[in-house]
Amino acid sequence: MFDLDGTLVNTAQDITNALNFAIKPYGMKILTVEDTIQLIGEGISRLVEKILSVENMHLKSELMNRFLEYYSEHLIEHSKEYPHVKETLENLTTVKKAVISNKREDLSKRLLEELGLSEYFDLIIGSDTAGERKPSAVPVLYIISRLGLSPEESIIVGDSNYDIEAGEKAGVKTVAVTYGYRSRESLMGADYIIDDIRELVPLVNEISET
């Protein structure tokens, strides 16, 4: 199972643009892509909370609505899959594949469809699918159950500690990618760390043989 943002697709610019649209009327500091990258990972609700001060927390609902209004209309204006993602998915033909995102399910599906990636997956779930989001084990176990697998034969691939923690709690192997939104140092808890998604194909074969 794959994380979405920062693992399959670089969505940082479009998320940054949506955040800046949301906060513009309130005179808040304009965010750079680098600012946004530090905030991404726990879903839209937490994303908005992180940019609000305690005094401004009453604006959360309004900012979320403005964010979603803009983001849903500009979903793939700048977003694109990372290098070799399609090639890797095409080469993983013998395994069931799923997407496990902290982005809302409808947005996750639209993003993957518009980028021509949805056809590679047996299941796509978002933050609102299983009742909980990463780093909870619940969405991981939900996917395992839906696909008729066991934790022992499952792998989660992601770019953040949320992915690693969710995988560990669910008892699945964890693979961290270093090309996403987090540093290699922050990913050291993963069972495996890869710099290029193409490394996943031989790694999956190796894990399946053990």
Over which residues does each language-model region extend?
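Active-site neighborhood of HAD-like aspartate-dependent phosphohydrolases
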Residues: 1-38
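An amphipathic alpha-helix signature
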Residues: 16, 20, 33, 37, ...
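Conserved SAM-binding loop
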Residues: 1, 8, 97-100, 156-157, ...
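Short, acidic loop-to-helix structural element flanking the phosphoryl-transfer center
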Residues: 73-99, 105-109, 137
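Asp-based, Mg2+/Mn2+-dependent phosphohydrolase catalytic module
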Residues: 34, 109-210
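Helix-loop "lid/cap" segments that line or gate small-molecule binding pockets
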Residues: 22-23, 43-57, 111, 143-144
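Metal-dependent phosphoesterase signature
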Residues: 49-87
